[in-house]
């Protein structure tokens, strides 16, 4: 399933489920561009991180936006014990070595989130920088919401960091509400953020907007 839409000034966008075969590298690059600052201490350098992410994607745990056949955005989600980004502890140690890999595993553990029964957890949205603010994120969120409904989930949950107010504003427009903020000042110097807000949206609800503003 998927959707077609026309974004302001960008032409026809197609939203599809799953990562197309052969597009793993492109997805990893977009993901790293969006989340590299946060994930950098665990996966740097970029020339090692991007191939690692690409090699360990669960390609059925994403919805992608395409423009003229090229992926310009994606949203990952976690359900049924699997998320978009994978990679076992053994894979991390193979890629980075045992000495340097152990502390990376500890950092990656900070980002682990498990859905409660009836929840689908979103792993964040990554959009091509040239197309941000043109409706791509809204289309991706609504497709994830459709996935959640089909899986009989009651709600969608996500976390947003305090240094990404634009993403939080988008989530609020699409019907998410903040339920808890965890202040983590001890992580600011290491990961670049000092608070994480958990947001939820009931499945079957949303906003009346069709596009990002």
Description of each model-found segment:
Residues 63, 75, 120, 125, ...:
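Conserved GNAT-family N-acetyltransferase fold
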Residues 12-29, 40:
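A short beta-loop-alpha structural element at the N-terminal edge
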Residues 81-120, 187:
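Conserved acyl-donor/pantetheine-binding loop and adjacent beta-alpha core of acyl/acetyltransferases
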């Amino acid at each position: 399933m998927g959707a077609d839409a026309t974004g302001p000034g960008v032409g026809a966008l197609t939203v599809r489920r799953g990562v197309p075969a052969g597009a793993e590298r492109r997805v990893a690059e977009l993901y790293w561009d969006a989340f590299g600052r946060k994930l950098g201490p665990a996966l740097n350098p970029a020339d090692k991180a991007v191939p690692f992410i690409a090699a360990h994607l669960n390609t059925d745990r994403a919805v992608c936006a395409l423009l003229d056949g090229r992926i310009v955005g994606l949203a990952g989600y976690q359900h049924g014990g699997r998320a978009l980004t994978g990679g076992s502890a053994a894979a991390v140690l193979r890629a980075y070595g045992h000495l340097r890999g152990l502390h990376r595993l500890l950092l990656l553990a900070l980002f682990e989130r498990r859905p409660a029964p009836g929840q689908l957890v979103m792993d964040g949205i990554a959009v091509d920088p040239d197309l941000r603010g043109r409706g791509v994120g809204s289309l991706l969120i609504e497709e994830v919401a459709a996935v959640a409904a089909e899986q009989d989930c009651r709600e969608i949950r996500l976390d947003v960091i305090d240094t990404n107010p634009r993403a939080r504003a988008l989530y609020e427009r699409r019907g998410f509400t903040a339920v808890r903020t965890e202040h983590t000042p001890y992580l600011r110097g290491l990961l670049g953020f000092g608070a994480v807000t958990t947001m939820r949206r009931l499945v079957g609800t949303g906003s009346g907007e069709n596009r990002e503003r």
